[in-house]
Amino acid sequence: MSVGKTTLVNALKNSPEFKDYHFRTERSKHLMNLGIPLNTDSTLKGQLVFASERAAELMQEKIITDRTVIDVMAFADLSESMKDHEKFYLNATLFYLIKEYDILFYVSPEGVEIEDNGVRETNAEYRTAVDEKIKQIVGMYRKNTITIKGTVEERIEQVKKAVAQYV
């Protein structure tokens, strides 16, 4: 889903405030090249790969990532290939990891054009469905989420401000 999360994380790498942080960005293209189906074609096995990457990230201190277990939960819920019970049990397990994030940002897609990177789904309706699902999951399980939007520069400042208040 193209909302500028990877762009934001890559921009934060250049900020002196985050020099001691580890950064991780999406690996969808790499995983697709391994034969893992994405988007509406995603499978339980594929979502388990994504989930294991997100869980591994949570074992590190001072990490900034553009994906969370919430993304995995949303994409699993919207998969047309997964069975309902697979979605339920995967998401019921991932639910326990949501609290592991020190700060969780919801990055609004408002004003961001869908970018065709050859991997992500470019269907605007699907993008909206993913966004709505993410907001639903966040609303149910993580009340203290910070919404950021605007230009990349504005988003950087919003992240810096939130992190400065936390640390």
Residue ranges and their predicted role:
Residues S2:
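Walker A (P-loop) phosphate-binding loop of P-loop NTPases
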Residues K5:
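Conserved lysine of the Walker
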Residues L8:
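Hydrophobic positions on the alpha1 helix immediately C-terminal to the Walker A/P-loop
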Residues K13-A56:
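Conserved substrate/cofactor phosphate-moiety recognition/catalytic segment
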Residues E26, R67-V69, Y106-G111:
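Short loop/turn segments at strand-loop or loop-helix junctions that form parts
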Residues Q47-K99:
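Glycine-rich phosphate-binding loop used to anchor ATP phosphates in small-molecule kinases
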Residues E80-E153, E157-Q158:
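A glycine- and Lys/Arg-enriched "phosphate-lid" helix/loop adjacent to the NTP-binding pocket
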Residues Q158-Y166:
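C-terminal alpha-helix
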